Amino acid sequence: MMSTTTTSSAAGSPVCARRRQRVFVDVPRRRATSLARVEYAKMAPPPPPPCSVRAAGSNPIGCLEVAEPWSGAAPPPLPPLPGHLHVAAPAAEDDDDALAAAAAAVPSEQRVHDVVLKQAALAAAAPEMRRPAQLAERERVAGGLNAAFDRCGEVCKEYAKTFYLATQLMTPERRRAIWAIYVWCRRTDELVDGPNASHMSALALDRWESRLDDIFAGRPYDMLDAALSHTVATFPVDIQPFRDMIEGMRLDLTKSRYRSFDELYLYCYYVAGTVGLMTVPVMGISPDSRANTETVYKGALALGLANQLTNILRDVGEDARRGRIYLPMDELEMAGLSEDDIFDGRVTDRWRCFMRDQITRARAFFRQAEEGASELNQESRWPVWASLLLYRQILDEIEANDYNNFTKRAYVPKAKKIVALPKAYYRSLMLPSSVRHCSSLTSS
């Protein structure tokens, strides 16, 4: 959702991908969260999960069984949002010809844009579509849900300290909902990037997606699921971005090269851009904003893409040591670079030129993200601005390292982070850019 902006260690499996950085910042690559057990009445045990990922503590994270089974009631879910639009995944390497043909027909950016339009329309129509709040039901299960949300907050505080701090400005309901989404994203990420990633299979991800369906249907399995189930029953959050994130996990099991930026764009949407679409309905749009809903959602998507592209550029050497290249292969070829140049870590003039182009692209997405960030509810802006400013500085550090991202890890020094956080807070207090733009037009 941030001492480096993130810390990283090698994954324990060749199928592991890098830790995906999304709108959440300060997410160290520690292996798993030790989740405290909370005593609830026992229920019949469910079918065994497809894997068991355990941390140094007594409880696993990142797999289907995490805490005690949830026996409390959950608020009835919202009616299904109409018109779900699925974004088809790129094919594995052996289907590259089919992938190229499909990409030529409908570019990934257009497919993702269609999803953004759908999400924006659903959010705009949400007040008319939502079921009346079940206040009595919420009060009846408040005790158990409070414990669930508190645990989500503990996980967020431990693994995303700066992001957690920034959420303190949000209203309690929004803050807790963001924590619940963060925890689900982290658990999903651990499926293919955790200590048991070598045992992960497509079937396990299918079961995780089935469990997601249960969450949205108001049938949570454990306390962390219950927190998310309550969140999606309270806010107009659509299931499709969650499904698409799982699709990104599937991609990491089968694909280690990306032929073009079109392919890479879709991957970045899956593992990072989706988070923006998940969280905007919770963060809300400022009542003063004069921007259309689509602009805000496109900005949230752009921040996820920018963060992920930055993450990719920072971790080129680390990924190469795992046999992975998350760079557009056609652009590498046009720059006169080969896979051997990547695996050998050659910092040449050609590499510097190539990296300058990649950094320029990432910065363009950051600029687009600024447009959406300023339109959010004021109390929700600080964590978004913190993510944007801190991650953008990683690009500066790559340049400062003379584009050596093979053996040098770019990170934001603590002093710069300290300066960036109040700057992010100041930006969060400014009027939406759409209001400032209109004011400048009327005064001129």
UniProtKB/Swiss-Prot annotation:
Listed Gene3D superfamilies: Farnesyl Diphosphate Synthase
GO cellular component, one term: chloroplast membrane
Keyword Transit peptide among record annotations: yes
InterPro entries membership: Isoprenoid_synthase_dom_sf (IPR008949), Squ/phyt_synthse (IPR002060), Squalene/phytoene_synthase_CS (IPR019845), Trans_IPPS_bact-type (IPR044843), Trans_IPPS_HH (IPR033904)
Membrane topology, record value: Peripheral membrane protein
Annotated GO MF terms: 15-cis-phytoene synthase activity; geranylgeranyl diphosphate synthase activity; squalene synthase [NAD(P)H] activity
Keywords on record: Carotenoid biosynthesis, Chloroplast, Isoprene biosynthesis, Membrane, Plastid, Transferase, Transit peptide
EC numbers, comma separated: 2.5.1.32
Role played: Catalyzes the conversion of geranylgeranyl diphosphate to phytoene. Mediates the first committed step in carotenoid biosynthesis. May play a role in regulating carotenoid flux in response to abiotic stress in roots. May control flux to carotenoid precursors that are required for abiotic stress-induced abscisic acid (ABA) formation in roots.
Protein name: Phytoene synthase 3, chloroplastic
Source organism of the structure: Oryza sativa subsp. japonica
